[in-house]
From Swiss-Prot:
It comes from Arabidopsis thaliana. Disruption phenotype: Rga, gai, rgl1, rgl2 and rgl3 pentuple mutant displays constitutive GA responses even in the absence of GA treatment. The keyword Transport does not apply. The keyword Ubl conjugation applies. Induction: Upon seed imbibition, increased GA levels in the epidermis reduce DELLA proteins (e.g. GAI/RGA2, RGA/RGA1/GRS and RGL2/SCL19) abundance and release, in turn, ATML1 and PDF2 which activate LIP1 expression, thus enhancing germination potential. Keywords: Activator, Developmental protein, Gibberellin signaling pathway, Nucleus, Phosphoprotein, Repressor, Transcription, Transcription regulation, Ubl conjugation. GO terms for cellular component: nucleus. Residues 1-24 are annotated as: Disordered. Belongs to the GRAS family. DELLA subfamily. A motif (LxCxE motif) lies at residues 174-178. This is DELLA protein GAI. A motif (VHYNP motif) lies at residues 73-77.
């Protein structure tokens, strides 16, 4: 839509807004929220151009970036498709003496931190001739720049210096979260758009993390909460399988829990695992094979798998059970299986599980990334731990994210989750590009969206730290069971298969095992028994 940048006489505000609405036909809604105009039909091309831009920005020599110096900006009219063409042309110019249309801005205008003075966030021009919004942005050194954005002409600035922008990007994310907490949505809306523009100048993990957090903030600001449906559960299962293949976190979770279960079942003739996190049953082939190799022959193995309903009432738990039954037959393990569909673990009752006397059958209860989902419903976690207590298992294995994303204070959980997922995405950067990696990032992005955009019962990604779980389990009548040094050594060997083990770290903490990236623990495996007290 062409606009006159010089004459604003007597244009009706309502008419202008209608014109903008008409102009948005065919535009992607979520990107529009972030301030980008991208037609749905252009999405594939835009994605390809972004990928080309990332490759060129990472490969180009520093000297060749002189035209994109720190003092330089690209003016972005929010038409992302056109802007990408412009950036690609600038980074790969014609051989002729082409001039770059880059505008310099004074150093004082380069902001170190985003904050918006809400008192001057909206100011209508006198006489009604021009509809303007004055926004005052402050930087940490006290320098102030006032920008005036008219409804007739809005020009967004995208700075290209990646390192300095990274600092600004983090400041903008935190400032936006603070504005959301204070319910200052005018400020939050302005900042979330700035985040979108700053994120484009980043490469690698930083850009991906910022984009997911920007989406989550936008959803919270505009109340576009992601839905929770059976289809979402099915999608999450699929994404989790890609995550399992891409990086060692789920493999570590399964391996360490299995080691604790294997040790608890030593010498038992009949064993029963109750899995709170059945999903696709990825954890159990390895345990079954270990049981098959046990001296003196394998025990009778009974598995009870619990999972959420599937779309179209598809019985995926039965299908998983059939696959495991075929494996059991091949490795000569006597196998029994039963699947339970439950909307929530809080619907379970011990009487449903056909428990047998402990002298006949030994039981293990297993939960991987499930218990935190109960924390949004009053009394749910206490009920489930009460059921586990009634089961009287030999061992209760639990794997949870090692981070507190369940603070009642929004800014606290936002800050914690920003650090946590930045580390996780950073650990994925060494993974070769491919479908598994992309789907793993989507898997984590959905978690980010839930932590930031949702509240009440819809917010299920309520991760807590091992120390918080330790207190909760202690109050419910459980005592920690030490996970042996054998598991520690073998887990360390497992990590060597990923990126040569570089960057990953296994730590022992009071009998529990943690897997982290560099100095940051990310997931924790713990084992519990009924307290003798």
């Amino acid at each position: 839509m062409k606009r006159d940048h010089h004459h604003h006489h007597h244009q009706d505000k309502k008419t202008m807004m209608m014109n903008e609405e008409d102009d948005g036909n065919g535009m992607d809604e979520l990107l529009a929220v972030l301030g980008y105009k991208v037609r749905s039909s252009e999405m594939a091309d835009v994605a390809q151009k972004l990928e080309q831009l990332e490759v060129m920005m990472s490969n180009v020599q520093e000297d060749d970036l002189s035209q994109l110096a720190t003092e330089t900006v690209h003016y972005n009219p929010a038409e992302l498709y056109t802007w990408l063409d412009s950036m690609l042309t600038d980074l790969n110019p014609p051989s002729s003496n082409a001039e770059y249309d880059l505008k310099a801005i004074p150093g004082d205008a380069i902001l170190n931190q985003f904050a918006i003075d809400s008192a001057s966030s909206s100011n209508q021009g006198g006489g009604g001739d021009t509809y303007t919004t004055n926004k005052r942005l402050k930087c940490s050194n006290g320098v102030v720049e006032t920008t005036t954005a008219t409804a007739e002409s809005t020009r967004h600035v995208v700075l290209v210096d990646s390192q300095e922008n990274g600092v600004r990007l983090v400041h903008a994310l935190l400032a936006c979260a603070e504005a959301v907490q204070k319910e200052n949505l005018t400020v939050a809306e302005a900042l979330v758009k700035q985040i979108g523009f700053l994120a484009v100048s980043q490469i690698g993990a930083m850009r991906k993390v910022a984009t997911y957090f920007a989406e989550a903030l936008a959803r919270r600001i505009y109340r576009l909460s992601p839905s929770q449906s059976p289809i979402d559960h099915s999608l999450s299962d699929t994404l989790q399988m890609h995550f399992y293949e891409t990086c060692p976190y789920l493999k570590f979770a399964h391996f360490t829990a299995n080691q604790a279960i294997l040790e608890a079942f030593q010498g038992k003739k009949r064993v029963h695992v109750i899995d709170f996190s059945m999903s696709q049953g990825l954890q159990w082939p390895a345990l079954m094979q270990a049981l098959a190799l046990r001296p003196g022959g394998p025990p009778v193995f009974r598995l009870t798998g619990i999972g959420p309903p599937a779309p179209d009432n598809f019985d995926y738990l039965h299908e998983v059970g059939c696959k495991l039954a075929h494996l059991a037959e091949a490795i000569h393990v006597e196998f029994e299986y039963r699947g339970f569909v439950a909307n929530t673990l809080a619907d379970l009752d011990a009487s449903m599980l056909e428990l047998r006397p402990s002298e006949i059958e030994s039981v293990a209860v297993n939960s991987v990334f499930e218990l935190h989902k109960l924390l949004g419903r009053p009394g749910a976690i206490d009920k489930v731990l009460g059921v586990v207590n009634q089961i009287k298992p030999e061992i209760f294995t639990v794997v949870e994210q090692e981070s507190n994303h369940n603070s009642p204070i929004f800014l606290d959980r936002f800050t914690e989750s920003l650090h946590y997922y930045s580390t996780l995405f950073d650990s994925l950067e060494g993974v070769p590009s491919g479908q598994d990696k992309v789907m793993s990032e989507v898997y984590l992005g959905k978690q980010i969206c839930n932590v930031v955009a949702c509240d009440g019962p819809d917010r299920v990604e309520r991760h807590e730290t091992l120390s918080q779980w330790r207190n909760r389990f202690g109050s419910a009548g459980f005592a920690a069971a030490h996970i042996g040094s054998n598991a520690f050594k073998q887990a360390s060997m497992l990590l060597a298969l990923f990126n040569g083990g570089e960057g990953y770290r296994v730590e022992e903490s009071d009998g529990c095992l943690m897997l982290g990236w560099h100095t940051r623990p990310l997931i924790a495996t713990s084992a519990w028994k009924l307290s003798t007290n």
